[in-house]
Amino acid sequence: FTKLDDIGRVAVVTQNGRPILVSDVATVSIGPRPRSGIVAFNEHDNVVQGIVLMTKGQNATKVVEGIKAKIGELKLKLPPKLKMVPYYDRTNLVKHTVHTVVENLLVGAFLVVAILIIFLRNWQAAVSVAVVIPLSLLFAFVLMDVRGVSANLISLGGVDFGIIIDSAVVLVEALMVKLALADTGQFPQHANYSWRVHTLKNTALELGRPILFSKAIIILAFLPIFTFQRVEGKIFSPMAFTLTFALLGAILLTLTLVPVLVSYAMKNGDLAEKHSVWMDALQKNYRRLLGWAESQRKLIVVISVALLAITLLLSPRLGSEFLPKLDEGNIWLTITLPPSTAIEKTKEIERQVRAILNSYPEVNNVTTQVGRPDDGTDPKGVNNLEIMADLNPKDTWKFADKEALITDMEKKIHALPGVPTNFSQVIEDNLEESLSGVKGEIAVKIYGPDLEILENKSEQIANVLRGIRGATDVAAIKIGGQSELNIVMNREQMARYGINISDVNNTIQTALGGSTVNSFFDGDKRFDVTVRLAESYRDAVDDVADLPINLPGGNGIIPLGEIAKVEIKQGAGRISRENGGRLVAVKANLLGRDQGGFVAEAMEAVNEQVKLPPGYNITWGGQFENQQRALARLKIIVPLSVLMIFVLLFWAFRSMMKALLVMLMVPFTLIGGLAGLGLSGLHLSVSAAVGFIAVAGISVQNGVIMVEQFMEIMLKGKGLKEAVMEGAVLRLRPILMTALMAGLGLLPAALSHGIGSETQRPFAVVIVGGIVSGTLFTLLLLPMLYPLFADEARHKDEAGE
């Protein structure tokens, strides 16, 4: 067909020699398809929305820049009064997070270099060490490119320049001490340039093994992170790869480039350790402290163990979660009305909610989506309403934080009758739904065969969750409430008339839903020709019951009501299945409450108050499920990693007791790490767990440095007590330097409140706090306990011989 009149002139049937045309029995016109969705933007009730998706592995910034260029070209071709307005651009979040990371890295690098200059008091030595920072990072970037790891918030957020250069610091500091001893006449050789180069070579050879071992230990400590899967794997594996690559680069540079740079520095200047009054005073007081500690060994051990025990006992008060929420700078609000809600009613509620959100000065713009797009890529009903509110910068807000803003919004929206809410963020919402199939932080899934029982139990569980502190947006995902036109065929009547079920189904489908019978062309455009009963003939149950059904052989017609029962019934709006079984879900979000504590309390309450019949069971999902999966994997991998580190230490010391002594210092990092989380108001999370893994490696490294020094001095013939005292004092400066650099390197990230800092903070806070407590106990407890463990090791060696 090329014209509407062509359709109207089609003959349907011939009666008494006269053709009955389509135009005689029907109205032929161009009409819209039934509307399945509506999009609104700020004060505009109807707009056209376009969404651009990026393919996997592409650079988001470059892709968006290309899209913006194309939009600029399209704007020039648009008709007057028509404009294109981007309402959501994810690169804004990327830019803010990159700015936060770069700022933290630059400030951290500055603090690390400052510590170098303060402690080494020689700019040439400081430069020789500091050059490792950019070069090791460049080395890491090359390997990241080979491995396919992109530079972003996660991969760069865990880079600590203090950890990266500590081996170079140990090497240069040891050389400076030897040169200073030569200047004081403690070495018989004349301290000329060739002797200094020889000393440098010997120092590098002596420390090469401990440096390799210490860095291998830190890399081994990251082994559990490499085993993470799914979400936690995608988040933390890039960080582990980046830091590992940087450490490998640091080892290579420390053992090759740094000695070369130091040799040039020695040729052009004096690298001997400068006399420092404050360091002398610090070492003097440290020597006194060690002497006192030796006389109070039992008391210090008891106090240390008591502090650790108290910290562990108080740690459950911190609460737990999978990951801290990343503030995306937007609000994603989902409202699901009863399944039978018409699109007009949903649109009416949408206008009211949009007006409420637009009334907040914190909101930049509001985009709403009712139903689904025409292409069917997001198959939601017209009872579904999704709203994205882009937020202004926080320094313009009147509310203290986002939680307070959402709480106020909730109060106003809940004043509208029958409007449930689910507040989230754009990326967070997509992540939650893809993981558990439920839009909510906490998802409770009830499995069983009977939909009625499932719905009843889901309401009971929802009521229980509403009574638990911190729960918000609690709702059972409705499966019923969908009004259906139910047509039940009377097979006996149909057999009496000789009517086939397929013929009746085809008639009902054409009359109510319409059937495409042909096509209509208007130039290059193609339109479907659809036959359907006029609305006045299908507007009520009685109208449908009067639908004419042809009898076989053209022997007349009968109404549908003669052979079927037609009625309105309430049916299931959706039936969800998982692993072959039916399920109904209950979702909840949290405000001011940790996930772990909430779920533990909720589980106990549900088990007490909700009794399931045989054949039914409950699982807890959402972000809590991710947390449990990550912790379950850590319970397996961390002991294996600890065992591998212990084997490495045993190989280094040739003594099981010395290896055990170094490992005993690791738990004391928990004191500072957990205290840091508590003071910062942060929960225990997978991010914090990764921090504890990293700081454990740093603690072991410091222990190795000190024990190696004890062993080296004892090889020179000095007694055990003297070797411990002298070695501890000698290692005070490098241990303090490495600890301060490692801590200050991540201090900006620990204190940062910029966009994207949420995921970095627990990791950084744990490392900074853990380094503080770990260093204190390494400096005090390890020298005090070493004689006990060394004697034990010596007895075992003698027994072996």
Show the residue positions of the predicted features:
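Signature of alpha-helical transmembrane segments and their immediate interfacial
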Residues: 205-207, 214, 274-324, 364, ...
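Transmembrane helices with small-residue packing motifs
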Residues: 145-150, 226-235, 305-342, 396-398, ...
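Hydrophobic alpha-helical segments
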Residues: 153, 201, 205-206, 213-269
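Interfacial helix-loop-helix hairpins and adjacent transmembrane helices
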Residues: 180-202, 231-237, 256-308, 339-345, ...
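Solvent-exposed, membrane-proximal periplasmic/extracellular interface segments of envelope transport
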Residues: 1, 9, 344-438, 463, ...
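Hydrophobic transmembrane alpha-helices and their membrane-interface caps
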Residues: 106, 110-177, 227, 245, ...
